[in-house]
């Protein structure tokens, strides 16, 4: 079991007047190192702890960890390369980048990696050894040069780079083949480029990645923490031939950057395989036929298809002959075909796994009405929780339990076979206080999940007040319950889980503290001795205690229960099936309670739509081309079947229709009477104005549309689809520049999953923190579930101001 008794860390990264010394460190919240050589010291801030690490003389300090509540600093000789990282509450681990790096900058004078062989493959002699060669440079004579073990170093500032004495008596020394760091040049296609060039090839200034002006985009730094999207520096997050950026020119959306190639060989990309492992980026076999039997054409060829996935543009991807490869982060190896009518297809590569996981759709004979529904709450400490939640209290996506990226760990399905470690679902394999997961953010090792305890009354329906959105964890709330991690909790709980009274935040007895006071945190609600969470602790609200032997402890503040009328919160947890709308996944009945069926007054279903308030439905404007008279239409709510409607459905006529004035494919319908909000009829939430969904965000479409002969016709179906950034969607091989900024793409480029005729106007919803938000209205596509032709949806966030104005004035 991983140790986790120490406490969450202050999330303040204060700026130092001398610069930003913490830039020299990689930080990971919720992580600790097993260390033998260490010192435990007091420190009032993270910077003070970093200074102690720099000043240490008894050993080389490679890392430190800081415990904010105790103001405790532990400096260590080890880092993740030499020790085990484990999960711990209330701590942040800082590791010096220079000791994690296996590349050199300039002549490698500051190289502190672990390469220990020369360029000819001879093992290096230890710097402290005198055999077989008596050294001129040793740890004793040059203590500040990092002459540890037998690692390659450059103590004499040699222009040719790091070197070492060799273990060959005939060869006194030789140079080491250390790759260049990608801060001034790039290896391969610049996927790991970390430099500061911020102009394009034509000299245009780059737009900052965290800006949506002048170009709105889906490459949001907080959603892609491992892509290093800093400031406005050129980067390559999506498999282009080289780094690029969005430009500050409103007339030029994006352009490649001119980054020079490094002159040294690139770092090793790891083992290669003759079979499919993961997404096949390291597949090096000789399959050259696609899934439908088309022959692949050579990567160097430009007929019958012109393209830029060439050996020159992707020099590290082994684009040999016409073999299937995955040079750009697709879901599997693929190739361009020799068929002029089929530009490219995925290849069928044998799996490296002895028993590959089936990707067939669920059993079509399983009666959907009888399918058990997993409740999204947990009992006790959550060890028995087997739901499908995969989001933390701060909205981070969970890392798969079988994955070692970005966090290496031992909580695997093999090591914990009875813990239900499926996919990336929240679990509690080690008897913690509640379900948790490792996160996909490299700087945050783990967090608790955004789940509440079961109350015993889950699923009960209260009388429906007006629709209202719940606040998030940051919104101050005076209720004696909390949202998320309770950072906005402003209730009056003032005792810990053990019943000990809390110390007042302004008091310095019995515990003296400097960081969490009303003066230093004036907006954190540090009144009297009430439980609070000023540092965003994953454990929730806490306080310093009045027990002189116990510095602090957590408070027992429950999660606020969601009511049946909260937008975006279904009473039946959706299946979240990876199956297909075309090819099928029948939804759990009433798990998408905002889905409506738009019908003629005679009852024929022809379009979908989304309930966004008791009186208003959002749909596609082209769905209203049948008639300009509202009386022609009616709306069915709460249905699971397209025909033979259930007795509880609501049938309401349309009283008014409003099409978007600039002719976007979006329209509002006002119902003749408000819908009755029940456990089967709940509105979806609207997004913030102009919000942009991040690239590769997994969202869901629903509908009763054409299923092309597959099972489930006539029942509400669902599919999980990734959002595709417009920059990618508008490539020549996909939708070739036809997608507007007021639209978004979603779908699997292999085809097979899409919305079809009859799904038009229906919702594309994305889960954010604790609710589903309507991000798209199904609009158009080229065919139905065709390869390379993802579906196109109206981007709802661009029309929120119009939507709210129409609703307010009518």
Swiss-Prot record:
It catalyses: Preferential cleavage: Lys-|-Xaa > Arg-|-Xaa, higher selectivity than trypsin. Converts fibrin into soluble products. Its main location: secreted. SUPFAM superfamilies: Hairpin loop containing domain-like, Kringle-like, Trypsin-like serine proteases. It comes from the Eukaryota. This is Plasminogen. Residues 103-181, 184-262, 275-352, 377-454, 481-560 form the Kringle domain. Residues 1-19 form the signal peptide.
């Amino acid at each position: 079991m991983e140790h986790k008794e120490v406490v969450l860390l202050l999330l303040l990264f204060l700026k130092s007047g001398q610069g930003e010394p913490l830039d020299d460190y990689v930080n990971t919240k919720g992580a600790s190192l097993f260390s033998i050589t260490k010192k435990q010291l007091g420190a009032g801030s993270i910077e003070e702890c970093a200074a102690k690490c720099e000043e240490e003389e008894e050993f080389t300090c490679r890392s430190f960890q800081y415990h904010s509540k105790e103001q405790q600093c532990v400096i260590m000789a080890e880092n993740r390369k030499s020790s085990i990282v484990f999960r711990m509450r209330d701590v942040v681990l800082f590791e010096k980048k220079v000791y994690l790096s296996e590349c050199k900058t300039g002549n490698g004078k500051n190289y502190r990696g672990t390469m220990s062989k020369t360029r000819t493959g001879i093992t290096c002699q230890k710097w402290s050894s005198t055999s077989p060669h008596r050294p001129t440079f040793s740890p004793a004579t040059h203590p500040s040069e990092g002459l540890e073990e037998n690692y390659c170093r450059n103590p004499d500032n040699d222009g040719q780079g790091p070197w070492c004495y060799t273990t060959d008596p005939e060869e006194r020394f030789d140079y080491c083949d250390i790759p260049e760091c990608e801060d001034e040049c790039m290896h391969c296609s610049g996927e790991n480029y970390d430099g500061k060039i911020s102009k394009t090839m034509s000299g245009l200034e780059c737009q900052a990645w965290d800006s949506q002006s002048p170009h709105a985009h889906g490459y949001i730094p907080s959603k892609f923490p491992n892509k290093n999207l800093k400031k406005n520096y050129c980067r390559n997050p999506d498999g282009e031939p080289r780094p690029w950026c969005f430009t500050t020119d409103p007339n030029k959306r994006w352009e490649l950057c001119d980054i020079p190639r490094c002159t040294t060989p690139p770092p090793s990309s790891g083992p290669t395989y003759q079979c499919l492992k993961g997404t096949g980026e390291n597949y090096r076999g000789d399959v050259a036929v696609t899934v439908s039997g088309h022959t692949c054409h050579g990567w160097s060829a430009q007929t019958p298809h012109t393209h830029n996935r060439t050996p020159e543009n992707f020099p590290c991807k082994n684009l040999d002959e016409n073999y299937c490869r995955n040079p750009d982060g697709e879901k599997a190896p693929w190739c361009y075909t020799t068929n002029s009518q089929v530009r490219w297809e995925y290849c069928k590569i044998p799996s490296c796994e002895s028993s590959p996981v089936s990707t067939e759709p669920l059993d079509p004979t399983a009666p959907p009405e009888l399918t058990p529904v997993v409740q999204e709450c947990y009992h006790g400490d959550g060890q028995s929780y087997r739901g499908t939640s995969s989001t933390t209290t701060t909205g981070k996506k969970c890392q798969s339990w079988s994955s070692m990226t970005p966090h290496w760990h031992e909580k695997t399905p093999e090591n914990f076979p009875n813990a239900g470690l499926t996919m990336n679902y929240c679990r509690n394999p080690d008897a913690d206080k509640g379900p948790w997961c490792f996160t996909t953010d490299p700087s945050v090792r783990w967090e608790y999940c955004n789940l509440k305890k079961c109350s015993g009354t889950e699923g009960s329906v209260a009388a429906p007040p007006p629709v209202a959105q719940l606040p998030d964890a940051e919104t101050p709330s005076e209720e004696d319950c909390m949202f998320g991690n309770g950072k906005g909790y402003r209730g009056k709980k003032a005792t810990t889980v053990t019943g000990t009274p809390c110390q007042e935040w302004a008091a310095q007895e019995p515990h003296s503290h400097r960081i969490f006071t009303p003066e230093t945190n004036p907006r954190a609600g540090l009144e009297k001795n009430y439980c609070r969470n000023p540092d965003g602790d994953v454990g929730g609200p806490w306080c310093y205690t009045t027990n002189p032997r116990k510095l602090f402890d957590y408070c027992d503040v429950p999660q606020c229960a969601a009511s049946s009328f909260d937008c975006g919160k279904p009473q039946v947890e959706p299946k979240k099936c990876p199956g297909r709308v075309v090819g099928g996944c029948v939804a759990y009945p009433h798990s998408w309670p905002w889905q409506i069926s738009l019908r003629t007054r005679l009852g024929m279903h022809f379009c979908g739509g989304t309930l966004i308030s008791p009186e208003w439905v959002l749909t596609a404007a082209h769905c209203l081309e049948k008639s300009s008279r509202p009386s022609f239409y009616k709306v069915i709510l709460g249905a699971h079947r397209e025909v033979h409607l259930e007795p509880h459905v609501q049938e309401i006529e349309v009283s008014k229709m409003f099409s978007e004035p600039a002719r976007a494919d979006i329209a509002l319908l006002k119902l003749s009477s408000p819908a009755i909000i029940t456990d089967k009829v709940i509105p979806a939430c609207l997004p913030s104005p102009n919000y942009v969904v991040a690239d590769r965000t997994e969202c869901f479409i629903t509908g009763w549309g054409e299923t092309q002969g597959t099972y489930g016709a006539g029942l509400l179906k669902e599919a999980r689809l990734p959002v595709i950034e417009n920059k990618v969607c508008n490539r020549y091989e996909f939708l070739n520049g036809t997608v507007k900024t007021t639209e978004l793409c979603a779908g699997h480029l292999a085809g097979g999953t899409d919305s079809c005729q009859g799904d038009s106007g229906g919702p594309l919803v994305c889960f954010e923190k604790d609710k589903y938000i309507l991000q798209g209205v199904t609009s158009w596509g080229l065919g139905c579930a065709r390869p390379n032709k993802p579906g196109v949806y109206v981007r709802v966030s661009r029309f929120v101001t119009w939507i709210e104005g129409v609703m307010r004035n009518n």
